[in-house]
Regions:
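Active-site neighborhoods and metal-handling regions in enzymes and metal-associated proteins
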Residues: 1-564
């Protein structure tokens, strides 16, 4: 079927005078979890990041290090798989006329990837012409009260107004829907794993705003936010709006503003390319948001604790990866505040655990055997909070070599958790701490140690992260994941992940755990742990027991007490 679709796509090349066509993973909102997954439809690759290039004779799929194994397993056989950090598209594809949809690319990433090629903008997406995606009806947006988010939308808008004035700008184009959600304190139902409403926004220095979205989505919030109906702009009318606006300087963020919108704006205004200030404002959570996240993680941790006990005590009953992830979902649903997963659960047994972002399906699901190591990475959206946690679980005695690797991953995890932060610490500096024990054994992992996390928004959020290249200063109120790992192709995967936040007492900054879920002790070589690390584990499991013992049955309590 896919090969037939590729043939149909190639038949369109002559009409548009192109040698190839570029298909990214993201949709026009640059969502990580795109509803219309064009990349999967043309390549069968289901990972959350990647770019396909279909040429007249060759097909290429560029992915990052998390997805190399998965891409080889999933993609149709005539795709050449390239790791994008090793070779950019322009290193392989040169002097070609390449077609692209300007709504799906920013000028920055297009130029970086496709130097030495002639890029041809095609407004009518060629994949959409072939697959005919159906538009799904969505529910109206809804508002969050100040008691939930801790700050009114008026206060946030004032901060943006001040930013515009200080940068001698008339307007800011907020192209990222999650930033619109944060600014207006609204949420929606447009995305499968995040309460982000599909909307964009233009705001001027006088605090006037124009919300760009489907008009039927905003009937509720028009009254609640006292927005004039004339300030609601249908997506197709963006050009008319820009022509009516007066002024000179327009700020866009070319990391998130598509070429399509950039081209419309620059016809009339001088473009000022600056980072959207909302990213940094949104990254620092206030006490209301932190407290709601703590409560969400308490509920999530109880589900995880029950799940881990259950799966370690199923008495030789053979289950599949899909069965396990469905069972975890049932435990989460016991909380009335649980809404849905914050991303597709990863439950990888044995060799599947080595696929960093593996997803078990009815076709790929594997039986979990007693000798397997099971990697479970999952998360939830709650009223109100976002969770993400990974545990590596075993069911029988493992080789000493595997225990040693697991313990070195754990030592890196603890090293991050116990970091005493200075004011100029960055994710790059902290990443070194996480990897150092593995690197002593010439081992490493091909992903960052941690990503930022949103408050009842995206589970992956910037600009902060713990990675080799991130130079953003870590500040009070930031939320990050702490997830070092190791993956042996065709054998096993190990990852230990907690969500952490930056806390301040007097002049000291340090990380505090959100996540409360038992860490697998049967994989630890205690001879490799020092007193500080052992004490960390003792206190961590004691905290879990104190929090959940009253909610567990006798057998669960006994098991949990044995971990202390």
């Amino acid at each position: 079927m896919i090969l037939k679709k590729i043939k149909i796509l190639r038949n369109k090349f002559k009409q548009y005078d192109i040698d190839g066509y570029i298909i990214p993973k993201n949709d026009e909102y640059f969502s990580e979890y795109a509803k219309n997954d064009r990349l999967k439809n043309i390549s069968n690759f289901s990972g959350s990041a990647g770019i396909a290039i279909i040429l007249k004779k060759n097909n290429y799929l560029f992915v990052d290090g998390r997805y190399t194994i998965q891409a080889h397993q999933e993609s149709v056989e005539n795709f050449k798989i390239i790791e994008i950090h090793k070779k950019l598209p322009h290193n392989i594809i040169k002097n070609c006329n390449l077609g692209y949809d300007p709504k799906l690319f920013t000028s920055k990433n297009l130029k970086n990837y496709f130097l030495n090629n002639n890029l041809i903008s095609i407004n009518d997406n060629l994949i959409d012409q072939i697959f005919k995606f159906k538009e799904k009806k969505t529910k109206p947006f809804y508002s969050l009260e100040k008691r939930v988010v801790g700050e009114t939308h008026q206060s946030k808008i004032s901060k943006i107004s001040s930013f515009l004035s200080s940068n001698n700008a008339d307007y800011l184009f907020v192209s990222a829907p999650e930033n619109v959600a944060w600014l207006l304190n609204i949420r929606g139902y447009d995305n499968p794993n995040s309460p982000i409403p599909n909307a964009r926004l233009i705001i001027d220095k006088n605090k006037n705003l124009f919300l760009i979205t489907q008009k039927n989505n905003v009937k509720k919030i028009i009254k609640e936010r006292k927005i004039n109906k004339n300030q609601i702009i249908d997506i197709k009318d963006i050009s008319k709006l820009i022509n009516k606006l007066k002024g000179r300087n327009f700020i866009i963020d070319n990391k998130t503003c598509s070429i399509f919108y950039e081209n419309i704006i620059k016809l009339k205004f001088k473009i000022l390319d600056k980072d959207d200030p909302i990213y940094k404002l949104k990254s620092i959570k206030n006490s209301y948001e932190i407290n709601h996240m703590i409560e969400a993680h308490k509920k999530d941790g109880l589900a995880l604790t029950r799940f881990i006990y259950w799966i370690k005590n199923i008495n030789k009953k053979i289950i599949t990866e899909v069965y396990a992830q469905n069972k975890l979902e049932k435990f989460r649903k016991l909380s009335k505040d649980y809404l849905y997963p914050s991303f597709n659960t990863i439950a990888g047994a044995g060799s599947n655990g080595a696929i960093v972002h593996y997803r078990a399906t009815a076709k790929t699901t594997k039986k979990i055997n007693a000798k397997d190591i099971l990697l479970v990475d999952s998360g939830g959206q709650y009223n109100y909070g976002t969770t993400d946690v990974t545990r590596t679980i075993c069911f029988s005695s493992q080789k000493q070599s595997i225990k040693n690797i697991y313990t070195n991953v754990l030592k890196g995890h603890i090293a991050v958790a116990l970091t005493n932060l200075s004011k100029d610490d960055t994710g790059k500096k902290i990443d070194i701490r996480a990897r150092k024990f593995l690197k002593k054994k010439n081992l490493d992992y091909a992903h960052g140690t941690g990503h930022g996390v949103g408050f009842f928004l995206n589970v992956h959020e910037g600009p902060q992260s713990i990675s080799k290249y991130n130079t953003i200063e870590i500040k009070k109120g930031m939320i990050l994941s702490n997830e070092p790992g190791y993956y042996k192709k065709n054998h096993f995967g190990i990852r230990i992940e907690n969500l952490i936040y930056v806390k301040q007492l007097k002049n000291k900054l340090f990380f505090e755990n959100f996540t409360l879920a038992p860490i697998e002790k049967d994989l630890i070589n205690y001879k490799l742990l020092n007193k500080i690390e052992k004490n960390y584990l003792f206190k961590y499991h004691l905290n879990i027991y104190s929090e959940y013992s009253a909610s567990l049955n006798k057998n669960q309590r006994k098991w949990l007490a044995s971990l202390i």
